[in-house]
Amino acid sequence: MAWTSVNWPRRAAVAFLAASVLGNVALALALHDSFVKLQFSRIFPLGHANESRPAATPAGPGRSMTFWGDSRSAMWDKEDLQTKWRIFDEAHGGTTSSQLRLLLLTLPPNRTDVSVVQIGINDLHPLGALGAHKAELLKQLRLNIVAIRDALLERSDLVVFTTIFPPGPVPLLRRAAWDPLTLQYVREFNEVVRDATDGRRVLLLDAHTILSGADSLLQREYADLDFFLHVNRQGYAALNAALMQVLERQPLPSK
């Protein structure tokens, strides 16, 4: 007992030192990760390195469809669509509306029959951490939605603009950077998306209505367990069915 009492302060000091070292290592790794992300965004303002991605299906006869936007568009389950469409993918994870607008200004035009776009959540989900710039960010998103529509009309016969997917319940670690008005902003900007469509060349796919529950959050059956902003295959199956219905109501012009 006496030996334990004598050595307890030493053991506590060793434990504290070990915890301090581990904490500093974790902090250093986090700072390095933040530095890498900051420099990457400065060097690659589109949010991704330049790359050449082939069509998801081989070139050949049939109508073509290009997906644009953020990770929700990049992760869209395109397998079922490939039986009838030649699919191209220009969507990238983390893309904001400003980055998509810049991409459309800089990417050489590759005309396709249909463009499908999902954009907006990456402008809205960081608002809690960017309160000083909120008004400007919201103004810019409104302008970008219209500019993206116009740019896509230059590249395709039809544009399918999807409303912003609802988020799932916000994880605890995300709540400090989550604006409590985010769900309201999602609804408001979905009205902007609706106003940007015309029922002729710009069609609406109301993804939010399909995926959301009564609380305006992503329905549990459609939630991706890995990330609260993502949708699972069941959700994309529902979206694909709706996409086909939208295109059936407004057929492409004959060639």
What are these regions (language model features)?
Residues 72, 120-122, 165, 208-211:
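Catalytic metal-binding/acid-base residues of hydrolase active sites
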Residues 118-124, 150-186:
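Active-site segments of SGNH/GDSL-like serine hydrolases
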Residues 14-17, 90-94, 131-138, 179-186, ...:
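Flexible, glycine- and charge-enriched loops at secondary-structure boundaries
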Residues 166-255:
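Catalytic His-Asp segment of secreted/periplasmic serine-dependent ester chemistry enzymes
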